[in-house]
């Protein structure tokens, strides 16, 4: 599956009155009806609600979960990958940085298991060229600059990751989709 066009992130933080599956599904539906080529959704519950309302939508799914022993929070482990896929995501977004994962799980093992047991297509949320290339080598078919500016090693930098994009595009295999994500705040960008 190749993305084309704008994929709209339809998410609401914990505690927000907008964090309701019906509200998220309505916002996703409105985005798709107004030209979005897909939506990026957080949590199995929201993914399921959008899949039910918009059965043909391209859904990039993730699950943000915090663990005390790790700074990885975007679909950090097998339990989250499995739940996001089961909820109806077409592509599962995972943190593909080299940071320590909860419970000692490792990126290579998670990617291999997701492909073997689920046949899931994976989007690597990365913060650097090295992490993007590594994720593609491990089997991720989408790479996004999602975590640029949000990890310990990139915390001083501000998204969007304009400098990262050409380097990734030059070095990633042509069949790997590259997504600019984060910090885009205007139509001109």
Task: Give residue spans per PLM region.
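Charged helix-capping and loop-helix junction motifs
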Residues: 21-25, 73-79, 105-111, 129, ...
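Glycine-enriched alpha-helix->loop->beta-strand junction motifs that scaffold or abut catalytic
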Residues: 35, 54-59, 86-91, 116-119, ...
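Glycine/Thr-rich beta-alpha phosphate-binding loop at enzyme active sites
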Residues: 90-102, 136-166
